[in-house]
């Protein structure tokens, strides 16, 4: 910088001239004029803080005035808080001596870089990756499935007839839910009631009525038809005896004519 900037003005305050002389004694000759103002501000703040701490220590010790011991104690406490200095050389030597007494770990016996075990290496990873399993949109919940074309073959389960279009001229049919009902109706083949009914095989006939003919309900009627074989065996026994008597009379008449 120019010499005019480094040289303090003659009409400057006495504190500024003292600070410039301190910088010159330390060998600092290249600086800006505002450096003097910054150094003066720092010195004023530092001295004020030290004197305030010394006054507190003096009042704590119940002294009438602040003496040099209070100022010295304040400087020592402020230096420990504001400034850091390296530890003493003797302290560092003691720590180094204790550390060097610990033997080094063994080297791994394989080819490659001769490094100590992983727990002693600073380059060893100290974390473990965990794989994230992403669930799909359909995983973890039940998906309903429709089975088309599966028809039950049980005889007792009624089947619903496929819907048929019925044209009505005056009234339009509304879609309704079709429900099936099953009624068992027994229809006898003859009016005569046998005296002793015998068990016989019956044939079951299923009659399916179109729901459009009767309404919104599908009625399944099961009729029990009695076979002809069972009716022949269940005839009146008195009638069979009368027929046998007639046959005997005819045989007697034939014998008389001969």
UniProtKB/Swiss-Prot annotation:
Region of interest called Disordered, as start-end residue ranges on this chain: 227-258
Modified positions (Phosphothreonine) in chain numbering: 159, 174
GO process terms (BP): DNA-templated transcription initiation; negative regulation of apoptotic process; negative regulation of transcription by RNA polymerase II; positive regulation of cell growth; programmed cell death; protein stabilization; response to thiabendazole; transcription by RNA polymerase II
Classification via Pfam families: TFIID-31kDa (PF02291)
GO CC terms: transcription factor TFIID complex; transcription factor TFTC complex
Subcellular location: Nucleus
Keyword terms, alphabetized: Acetylation, Nucleus, Phosphoprotein, Transcription, Transcription regulation
Main localisation: nucleus
SUPFAM superfamilies: Histone-fold
Residue numbers carrying Phosphoserine: 147, 177
Induction: By apoptotic signals in PC12 cells.
Ranges annotated as biased composition (Acidic residues): 244-258
Modified residues annotated as N-acetylmethionine in this record: 1
Ranges of Polar residues composition bias in the record: 227-236
Molecular function terms from GO: protein heterodimerization activity
Protein task: Essential for cell viability. TAF9 and TAF9L are involved in transcriptional activation as well as repression of distinct but overlapping sets of genes. May have a role in gene regulation associated with apoptosis. TAFs are components of the transcription factor IID (TFIID) complex, the TBP-free TAFII complex (TFTC), the PCAF histone acetylase complex and the STAGA transcription coactivator-HAT complex. TFIID or TFTC are essential for the regulation of RNA polymerase II-mediated transcription.
The family this protein is said to belong to: Belongs to the TAF9 family.
Assembly description: Binds TAF5 and TAF6. Component of TFIID and the TATA-binding protein-free TAF complex (TFTC). TFIID is composed of TATA binding protein (TBP) and a number of TBP-associated factors (TAFs). Binds N-terminal domain of p53/TP53 which is essential for transcription.
Name of the protein: Transcription initiation factor TFIID subunit 9B
Organism of origin: Rattus norvegicus (Rat)
Gene field: Taf9b
């Amino acid at each position: 910088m120019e010499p005019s900037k480094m040289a303090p003005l003659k009409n400057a305050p006495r504190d500024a001239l003292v600070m410039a002389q301190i910088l010159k004694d330390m060998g600092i000759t290249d600086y800006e004029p505002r450096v003097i103002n910054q150094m003066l501000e720092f010195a004023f703040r530092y001295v004020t803080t030290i004197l305030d701490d010394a006054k507190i220590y003096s009042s704590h010790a119940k002294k009438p005035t602040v003496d040099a011991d209070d100022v010295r104690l304040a400087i020592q406490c402020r230096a420990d808080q504001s400034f850091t200095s390296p530890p003493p050389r003797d302290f560092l030597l003691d720590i180094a001596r204790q550390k060097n007494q610990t033997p080094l770990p063994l080297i791994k016996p394989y080819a490659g870089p001769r490094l100590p075990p992983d727990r002693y290496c600073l380059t060893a990873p100290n974390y473990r990756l965990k794989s994230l399993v992403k669930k799909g949109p359909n995983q973890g919940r039940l998906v309903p499935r429709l089975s088309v074309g599966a028809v039950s073959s049980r005889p007792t389960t009624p089947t619903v007839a496929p819907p048929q279009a019925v044209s009505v001229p005056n009234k339009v049919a509304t879609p309704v839910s079709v429900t099936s009902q099953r009624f068992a109706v027994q229809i006898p083949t003859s009016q005569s009631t046998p005296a002793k009914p015998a068990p016989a095989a019956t044939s079951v006939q299923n009659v399916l009525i179109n729901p459009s003919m009767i309404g919104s309900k599908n009625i399944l009627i099961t009729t029990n038809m009695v076979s002809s074989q069972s009716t022949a065996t269940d005839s009146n026994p008195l009638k069979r005896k009368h027929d046998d008597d007639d046959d005997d009379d005819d045989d007697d008449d034939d014998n008389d004519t001969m």
